[in-house]
Amino acid sequence: MVAALARPGRELARQLLMIQSGAVIFVAAGMAVAINPDWGFSALIGGGIFVVANAVFALCAFMFSGARAAKRIAASFYTGEVLKILITVALFYVAYMYMQVELVPLKLTYLLVLGINICAPVLFINNKK
């Protein structure tokens, strides 16, 4: 029963991650074809940074469910958000320091996926009752 309470949230997070991943692949392929492969690679890295960090947050956020686990739920959300920020910083550091990436597509794709993360949940609202 308790696991069933978190199932809708997990499903929503999974759908959102799939939309984000698809958008990253689509934009990276488009930039690779339209501009050059370096831009496509950089776009893939930029969007991938966001998707990986968001996936870690989703795993932490929906680890617990139920009224008895309220403190653990709050702690897992906080832990997930901290990990998301740390992973984002670490992956951007690795991208800047150790990879030959173009900054414009890297940041544009990151911001695109961030926008999807903000706007896409509206698509999942179901007002039919």
Swiss-Prot record:
Keyword DNA-binding: no
Subcellular location: Cell inner membrane
GO CC terms in record: plasma membrane; proton-transporting ATP synthase complex
Pfam families per record: ATP-synt_I
Membrane topology of this protein: Multi-pass membrane protein
Entry-linked InterPro entries: ATP_synth_I
Domain of life according to the entry: Bacteria
Transmembrane portions of the chain: 16-36, 44-64, 77-97, 105-125
GO biological process, one term: proton transmembrane transport
Keywords: Cell inner membrane, Cell membrane, CF(0), Hydrogen ion transport, Ion transport, Membrane, Transmembrane, Transmembrane helix, Transport
Role of this protein: A possible function for this protein is to guide the assembly of the membrane sector of the ATPase enzyme complex.
Similarity remark: Belongs to the bacterial AtpI family.
Name of protein: ATP synthase protein I
Originating species: Vibrio alginolyticus
Source species taxonomy: Bacteria, Pseudomonadati, Pseudomonadota, Gammaproteobacteria, Vibrionales
